[in-house]
């Protein structure tokens, strides 16, 4: 507990907020190139093969990014757009690839939540 005198002399220093996506350096998204596309198994109660990509961002930082949706067309040297957002059951995965931007195609046959997966509106869908 500081004394009144200490508060007058030094004041209170505001706490620095730690970024949850430091590799983006304050940007909403960053472009990157896939170095390796693979699968990863999730943490304990869950079981699956989650699709991930190792991406070298335009600022030179390498990150592991999750590929959302069913099926993808990504391979080595694909150019992708990366956003922040962790995957709770994959340790160390703090970024996601944006589907439907650059080389990442949208999810085929997606009818609900299409904007999140870069899917075009189907011809027969009514309002």
Swiss-Prot record:
InterPro entries named among the record's database cross-references: NA-bd_OB-fold, Ribosomal_uS12, Ribosomal_uS12_bac
Residues the record lists as 3-methylthioaspartic acid modifications: 89
Keyword rRNA-binding: yes
One Pfam match: Ribosom_S12_S23
CC terms in the record's Gene Ontology section: ribosome; small ribosomal subunit
GO terms of molecular function: rRNA binding; structural constituent of ribosome; tRNA binding
Keywords attached to this entry: Methylation, Ribonucleoprotein, Ribosomal protein, RNA-binding, rRNA-binding, tRNA-binding
GO biological process: translation
Compositionally biased spans, kind Basic residues: 11-20, 112-127
Residue span of region Disordered: 11-30, 105-127
Family per record: Belongs to the universal ribosomal protein uS12 family.
Family annotation (PANTHER family): 30S RIBOSOMAL PROTEIN S12 FAMILY MEMBER
Subunit composition and interactions: Part of the 30S ribosomal subunit. Contacts proteins S8 and S17. May interact with IF1 in the 30S initiation complex.
Function in brief: With S4 and S5 plays an important role in translational accuracy. Interacts with and stabilizes bases of the 16S rRNA that are involved in tRNA selection in the A site and with the mRNA backbone. Located at the interface of the 30S and 50S subunits, it traverses the body of the 30S subunit contacting proteins on the other side and probably holding the rRNA structure together. The combined cluster of proteins S8, S12 and S17 appears to hold together the shoulder and platform of the 30S subunit.
Name of this chain's protein: Small ribosomal subunit protein uS12
């Amino acid at each position: 507990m500081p004394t009144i005198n200490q508060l007058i002399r030094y004041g209170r220093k505001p706490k620095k907020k730690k970024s949850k996506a430091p590799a983006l350096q304050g940007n909403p998204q960053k472009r990157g190139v896939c170095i390796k596309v693979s699968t990863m198994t999730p943490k304990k109660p869950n079981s699956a093969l989650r699709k991930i990509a190792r991406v070298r961002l335009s600022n030179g930082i390498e990150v592991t990014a999750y590929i959302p949706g069913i099926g993808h067309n990504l391979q080595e040297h694909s150019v992708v757009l990366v956003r922040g957002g962790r995957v709770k059951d994959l340790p160390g995965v703090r970024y996601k690839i944006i589907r439907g931007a650059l080389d990442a195609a949208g999810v085929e046959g997606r009818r609900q939540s299409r904007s999140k997966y870069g899917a075009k509106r189907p011809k027969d869908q009514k309002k």
